From Swiss-Prot:
This is Transmembrane protein 248. One of its GO terms (cellular component) is membrane. It is a multi-pass membrane protein. InterPro entries: TMEM248/TMEM219, TMEM248/TMEM219_dom. The keyword Transmembrane helix applies. It comes from Danio rerio (Zebrafish). Keywords: Membrane, Transmembrane, Transmembrane helix. The chain crosses the membrane at residues 22-42, 271-291.
Length: 315
């Protein structure tokens, strides 16, 4: 009865005599709190799906690492009231790739996907601009330049930027030098279907409606990925008399693949049940410590029994 009337004393005795169990109780309590917090986090937050390693956000962000060089020495291609069609964007490079390895029967061939993206053109000082109205920029890159691996690393992607307004040397003459230009362009990527992510696509743009010029000039550009800047292939005079183009993609939360609500609810339920079980375990041990905290008295050995045991051993 005395022990039952002194719960605080029992608890102190339990803590002082059983430190391993106390540490175990504290550890279990910490794990239970962690599970409870993680479960609540899964309930209120949208979590990116770990099963989908690449979506359109990550795919377009890789183009931010590419430098495009618009050089004065490039040849202009002239067109009259012509639009960028799937046939016009397919170049001889795709013909070369088809001759190297026979296409699979299931391969539908190159496809076009057009998305709106920001393009900056930063002319270097020797660059004087173009007297013609440039409305289209064209480039060709490999999959490895945008971070693709495996078979997709050797796939060629043809990129066409359709400018909303013509780009020429009028601004250069007006300011005495060419200033940086920022365009909201329509970027058309032509490549094999396996290059593109299989997740929800961003809103598409229509290249034919992006530029209202009756006649246009397409200029071919060269591309360089960011890794080249740190290798022996780096050329400090690359694009010396030209303009460097950079692509900037703004993250679109709608393109990120998230864990479905049903899965998040199931995860939250499992974590809650686990934390409740651990809390019940800790509470049970705590109640035991309060009710019966003092260890039982150690039974003392009988001296006569010890002497008899010694005598038997000596005999």
């Amino acid at each position: 009865m005395v022990l039952l009337l002194n719960p605080l004393e029992n608890l102190k005795t339990y803590i002082s005599n059983r430190p391993p169990l106390v540490i175990f109780m504290v550890s279990v309590s910490a794990v239970a709190i962690a599970f409870l917090t993680i479960g609540y986090f899964f309930k209120i937050k949208e979590i990116k799906s770990p099963e989908m390693t690449e979506d359109w956000n990550t795919f377009l962000l890789r183009f931010n690492e590419i430098d495009f060089c618009i050089s004065e020495n490039e040849t202009l291609k002239h067109g009259l009231n012509e639009s960028i069609t799937p046939e016009s964007t397919v170049t001889s490079s795709q013909t070369r790739s088809s001759t190297q390895s026979p296409p699979l029967l299931e391969d539908p061939g190159p496809i076009n996907i057009s998305v709106a993206i920001t393009l900056t053109l930063d002319p270097l000082r020797p660059f004087g601009g173009y007297s013609r109205n440039i409305t289209h920029l064209y480039a060709s890159v490999l999959g490895q330049q945008v971070g693709l691996a495996g078979r997709e690393a050797h796939e060629e992607m043809n990129i066409t930027f359709t400018l909303p307004v013509a780009w020429n040397s009028d601004e250069c003459v007006l300011h005495g030098r060419c200033e940086q230009m920022v365009f909201s362009t329509c970027m058309t990527v032509t490549a094999a279907s396996n290059v593109f992510p299989v997740t929800m696509q961003p809103p598409h743009c229509v290249p034919e409606t992006y530029s209202n010029a009756t006649s246009w000039y397409k200029i071919f550009t060269t591309a360089r990925d960011s890794d080249t800047k740190y290798t022996q292939e780096y050329n400090p005079f690359w694009c010396y008399k030209g303009a460097i183009g950079k692509v900037y993609h703004t993250l679109n939360p709608k393109l990120t693949v998230i864990v479905p609500d049903d899965d998040r609810s199931l995860i939250n339920l499992h974590l809650m049940h686990t934390s409740y079980f651990l809390f019940v375990m800790v509470i049970t041990m705590f109640c035991y410590a309060v009710i019966k905290g003092r260890p039982g008295k150690v039974r003392q050995n009988n001296p006569d029994f010890c002497q008899e045991k010694v005598a038997l051993s000596a005999g």
